[in-house]
């Protein structure tokens, strides 16, 4: 529902949610001019009176992601769901090098040349990464296509809320309020849809001690504390 996990201590559970509702989606599409002109839900809707879109243009989106198994599974589910609303989807699976290529070199992601794109984002801090969606993080030619905000989302109110949040410390009274403000704006504008959390999985021998996963660190972050067998205290 927002750009941080629901398990995060700063997650705002009061933000609005968007349930899966094809009937409501179809109604909204009809209202804005995307019509099911042939009365066939399996074919893409067509434009009738949509601003800046030629009449009868089919509603077909180009969707880019990597060829990883999990990405393929997610894209197939999303394409099927969008199809229930008369939205066609052309899914293109790219190598990591091609998907994450520099924008100036023709990369669809950092060049922001896509209708839909599925990609991974990660953080090594517990601090909510609101900067992912700030104006200064938009990849452009002027900043050598470096930046996390591949959506191109721009909202001065969000930028200000994020900057304010980053100025606070966890001990400040405004700390929670500041980050919840960014979540409220994000959820209202919804520049991106967080799909799922990637689980961190590891295995250890039964008599290993000191082994503990940290979501913000490498699996062997505390390698000095690891031991096994008789060396482990009861």
Predicted features and spans:
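Bilobed periplasmic-binding protein-like "clamshell/Venus-flytrap" ligand-binding domains
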Residues: 1, 34-65, 110-117, 168-206
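Active-site rim elements
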Residues: 13-16, 148-151, 163-173
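Periplasmic binding protein-like
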Residues: 83-143, 178
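Solvent-exposed loop/turn segments at secondary-structure junctions
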Residues: 8-11, 67-70, 96-98, 121-126, ...
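Append "and occasionally in soluble cytosolic enzymes with long acidic Gly/Pro-rich linkers
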Residues: 1-80, 84, 154-160, 181, ...
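Structured segments of extracytoplasmic/periplasmic soluble domains
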Residues: 28-35, 78-88, 102, 106-108, ...
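Surface-exposed intrinsically disordered loops and tails
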Residues: 38-40, 54-58, 101-109, 142-146, ...
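Long beta-strand-rich cores associated with HINT superfamily self-processing modules
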Residues: 133, 145, 202-234
């Amino acid at each position: 529902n927002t750009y941080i996990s629901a398990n995060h201590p700063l997650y705002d559970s009061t933000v609005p949610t968007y349930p899966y509702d094809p009937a409501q989606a179809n109604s909204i599409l009809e209202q804005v001019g995307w019509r099911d002109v042939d009365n066939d839900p399996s074919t893409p809707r067509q434009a009738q009176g949509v601003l800046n879109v030629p009449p009868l243009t089919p509603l077909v989106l180009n969707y880019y992601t990597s060829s990883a198994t999990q990405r393929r599974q997610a894209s197939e589910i999303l394409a099927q769901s969008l199809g229930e609303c008369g939205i066609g989807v052309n899914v293109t699976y790219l190598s990591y090098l091609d998907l994450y290529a520099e924008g100036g070199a023709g990369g669809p992601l950092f060049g922001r040349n896509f209708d839909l794109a599925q990609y991974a984002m990660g953080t090594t801090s517990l601090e909510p990464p609101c900067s992912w969606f700030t104006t200064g993080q938009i990849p452009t030619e002027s900043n050598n296509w470096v930046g996390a905000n591949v959506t191109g989302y721009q909202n001065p109110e969000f930028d200000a809320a994020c900057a304010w949040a980053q100025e606070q410390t966890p001990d400040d009274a405004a700390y929670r309020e500041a980050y919840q403000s960014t979540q409220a704006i994000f959820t209202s504008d919804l520049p991106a849809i967080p799909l799922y959390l990637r689980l961190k999985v590891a295995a250890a021998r039964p008599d290993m001690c000191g082994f503990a996963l940290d979501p913000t660190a490498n699996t062997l972050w505390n390698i000095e504390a690891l031991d096994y067998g008789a060396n482990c205290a009861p």
